[in-house]
């Protein structure tokens, strides 16, 4: 039976992610902060919610910045929400925070005066929104283009390499909704809260061999 490690660094609704993974037949799902268990897992999921400063402080305190670099190289790895943002180089949040740097690019604030065609948009971006599949990827299998996923975020990703952006969203500005590089895949939305399409993405992750 394959094992899926959900990295626990004290920030994130980990059990809802774990339950969704179990629901799609992920095998043995372990919510853990044990580096040895994470290293031995067949697949790794890196969720996160909250302020990036607090997240990165805990990630560094636990040595998970180097661990994430290590385990994401050679097995399927999925970053979710702030777990995705932590994989970028830098975030504007909390007066500026350096992140893990696996994906080039910046995490930027939507702004207090975000508008679309003259209409004021609330920040955070919260609710259902379409994701355009800009590049084909195994994790999009059986998910229609422009399917709707559930988002909750005040900061968005401006990716440094367009070729790594496999999904885009729009909320006042265009932003990277999904990034991919080798065995790494990361999403701004919450697949565990996104009903049919979110569960399909998690099922695709469980079936994925990490090649792209």
From Swiss-Prot:
Ranges where the Glutamine amidotransferase type-1 domain occurs: 3-212
Primary location recorded for the protein, binned into one broad class: cytoplasm
Single GO biological process annotation from the record: L-histidine biosynthetic process
Keywords for this protein: Amino-acid biosynthesis, Cytoplasm, Glutamine amidotransferase, Histidine biosynthesis, Hydrolase, Lyase
Signal peptide: none
Cross-referenced InterPro entries: Class_I_gatase-like, GATASE, Imidazole-glycPsynth_HisH
Name assigned to this protein: Imidazole glycerol phosphate synthase subunit HisH
């Amino acid at each position: 039976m394959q094992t899926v490690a959900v990295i626990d660094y004290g920030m994130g609704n980990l059990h809802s992610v774990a339950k969704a993974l179990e629901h799609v037949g992920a095998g043995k799902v372990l919510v853990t902060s044990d580096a040895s268990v994470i290293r031995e897992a067949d697949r790794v999921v890196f969720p996160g919610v909250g302020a990036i400063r607090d997240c990165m402080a805990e990630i560094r305190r636990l040595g998970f910045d180097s661990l994430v670099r290590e385990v994401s190289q050679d097995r399927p790895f999925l970053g979710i929400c702030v777990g995705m943002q932590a994989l970028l180089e830098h975030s504007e949040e909390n007066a500026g925070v350096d992140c893990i740097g696996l994906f080039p690019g910046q995490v930027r604030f939507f702004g207090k005066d975000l508008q679309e065609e003259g209409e004021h948009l609330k920040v955070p971006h919260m609710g259902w929104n379409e994701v355009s599949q800009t590049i084909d990827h195994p994790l999009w299998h059986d998910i229609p283009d422009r399917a709707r996923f559930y988002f909750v975020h005040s900061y968005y990703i401006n990716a440094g390499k367009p070729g790594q952006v496999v999904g885009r969203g729009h909320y006042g500005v265009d932003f990277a909704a999904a990034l991919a590089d080798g065995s790494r895949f990361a999403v701004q939305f919450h697949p565990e809260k996104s009903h049919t399409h979110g569960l399909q993405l998690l099922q695709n992750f469980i079936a994925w061999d990490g090649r792209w």
